[in-house]
Amino acid sequence: MKVGIRAYEPFALGVKCYDASRPNTDYIRRRVPFSEDLFRGKNPGYKEFTLPFPLSPDQLMVEMFDKAYGDDDNFRIEKFELEKVPARSVWAEPDVHRFILFAQDFAVKAGYLPTGVYDSADGDFLIQYLPVIQDEQGNPLVTPARTNRKSGRIQVSQSAFSRYTIPVRLVVLFHERYHFQIPTRLEKPADLHGLRLYLDLGFPRTEAVYATTKIFNSHPESVGVGHRNRVKDIVNFIDNYSGIQNLKMNVQ
């Protein structure tokens, strides 16, 4: 989807795209800034951007509004074009390809599913959907998901996932899968392998950055130097992603 917006003055545009028939099914939530510099060029106040939807519902609702006031008085839509998403070739192991389908189905439905156990038809993948994830003493954990590296079973927090966009849910699920797939307990290899898969599928880079910052910003009291370095590594990987399958990623 290509969108062209003409702003009358500097402001921040809010964009929200969601399934019109289901609750908590946002495919994109985005802030698009229209800064003062934009009004000094040859085409003042005009900006184009693309909203990719490698995964979309039958009825997609698109809302655009002024982030400050919630109205549409400060801009007009000059372009709104639909384009077919090009087919993409994704390099991954056969079980990862099967997991992609399972993860996409769960990510789409997680906003309205009740808690419980959800598994794939072949029984290879299982998600335990919990109100919140707890430690052995019953204390709530801030993590949105965690993986048993021996079985591949994933625990997911409904409290967290119900607030995330569908792409953010996929970033988390792909990350968790690679803890089992590699296998590794280290965050960086799981981060980068999961992100590569997410980006290879054609999902938006912006939502990948949101996934990282949103999760850590939700609990700033737990963010340390290691977390900040992790965010830098992730953002650097996203910025330098070329779409070329790199089988020798430096993730050690």
Regions found by a protein language model. Name each.
Residues 203-252:
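Long, well-structured alpha-helical subdomains associated
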Residues 128-166, 177-180:
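Active-site scaffold of zinc-dependent metalloenzymes
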Residues 96-104, 174, 187, 191-195, ...:
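Extracytoplasmic/secreted envelope proteins and their assembly/folding machinery
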Residues 86-95, 159-161, 178-185, 221-223:
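Second-shell loop/turn segments in exported
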Residues 165-171, 210:
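Alpha-helical scaffolds flanking conserved acidic
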Residues 110-123, 182-186, 201-213:
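Surface-exposed patches in mature extracellular/periplasmic domains of secreted proteins
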Residues 159-163, 176-189, 193-205:
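Catalytic Zn2+-binding segment of zinc metalloproteases
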